[in-house]
Structures are given as C-alpha cells and as structure tokens.
Amino acid sequence: MSSLSETMIIGLTGGIASGKSTVVEMIKEAGYKVIDADQLVHDMQAQGGRLYRALLDWLGEEILLSNGELNRPKLGQLIFSNEEMRQRSAEIQGTIIREELAAQNDYLAKKEDIFFMDIPLLIENGYQDWFDQIWLVAVSPEVQCQRLMKRNHLSVEEAKLRIDSQMSLAEKMPYASLVLDNNGSLDDLKEKVKSAINDLTSSS
C-alpha cells in the first residue's frame, strides 16, 4: 500500500516474454508515469554504475567485453547456469535495485495521483506490499517459450530454463488485482488495458 493515501501506486508484472513491455507502452500513451525496473537495472549495469561495480567485484573481468562494458549474454549464461549462482546474483543485485526503486517511488508519490511500477520479479522479490493494486500480464507457457526464443535467440532448452527460474503463472495469480490475458491479438490487449485504465480513473 502506498504511504501517501491520495496516491495510487500500481505494480505491473508478468513472466519473461509475456508482453509486459507492450502494456507499459499503452499505459504511457494514456499519460501515466511508469517506473521501469528493467531500465533502471540496465542503467546501473552500464560501465561505472552501481550494479556494474558489484558484478565486477563478484565475477571478475571475464564478464566484460573488450571495451569494458558488460558482456550481457555471458552474464546471463553464468547467472542462469545453476540455482546457487542465480540466488547469489539476486542477493548482490537485489539490495541495490530495491534502494533505487524505493527512491524513485518516493519521488513520484509526491508528484502523481496515480503511477505504475514495472517490476518483472515483483512477487518473487517481495514487492507486493508496495502497491495498492497489482496487474499481472499473463500468457500460456507455450506462447511464452516461443516469444522468448524469438526475442532472445535462444534454444528451447535455454528458454525453458529461464522461464522455469521464475515463479509460475498459477503461483502469481492469487496476488493479482487484475489479470491481463495476452494470448490473443494486440488489439485485444489494447482493449483490455484501455478498460482497466477507465475502471481505475472512474474509481479514483
């Protein structure tokens, strides 16, 4: 729940390759601010950023490209290679990410009546208490796997490994105030998002 009663904060989440980014763009087009956790992480993993320094201290220079930037594909392979590595990554990066998200949350809560936070691992990382509502973008495992393979140029095995590293859709459902089914067309999704925003503004 948001700390400022007059401000409504909505958490947006969904599995990898669920189409959440498309929903974010629709929300932005409707005029709402969205804090993007993935972009925040990307910025902090840039050369010299807080996460860049933390990852370099942990894994050493083998995760760097020749120009000094992070080798993101190699980093992903290392982290997703086993559960111990994934948990250690979550510990190291999670604290820093939470601090940065909290700062952005506090800033927008002073300026906006309604805003969104796009956090892929919102439930897995225990962010649910931050929000007045949680919107979950949902797709079938088959659609999710196909989209992830195409988007990230992964094999079936690699895609399933990344999907299986996250909480399942069934486990996330009880936390959701609203489920946006994205197994259909783009137009179907637009209508669902438009309806959800209309309901939001009419009740606020």
PLM segments and residue spans:
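ATP-dependent NMP and nucleoside kinases share a basic, alpha-helical "lid"
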Residues: 102-110, 114-151
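ATP-dependent small-molecule kinase phosphotransfer cores
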Residues: 42-113
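Well-ordered beta-strand positions
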Residues: 33, 39, 133, 177-178
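An amphipathic alpha-helix signature
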Residues: 30, 52, 56, 141-146, ...
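Residue-level signature of catalytic and energy-coupling elements of molecular machines
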Residues: 89, 116, 180
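Small-molecule kinase domains that catalyze NTP-dependent phosphoryl transfer to phosphate-bearing small molecules
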Residues: 100-101, 108, 129-130, 150, ...
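Walker A (P-loop) phosphate-binding motif
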Residues: 2-32, 37-39
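Generic C-terminal helix-cap and adjacent flexible tail
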Residues: 4-6, 198-204
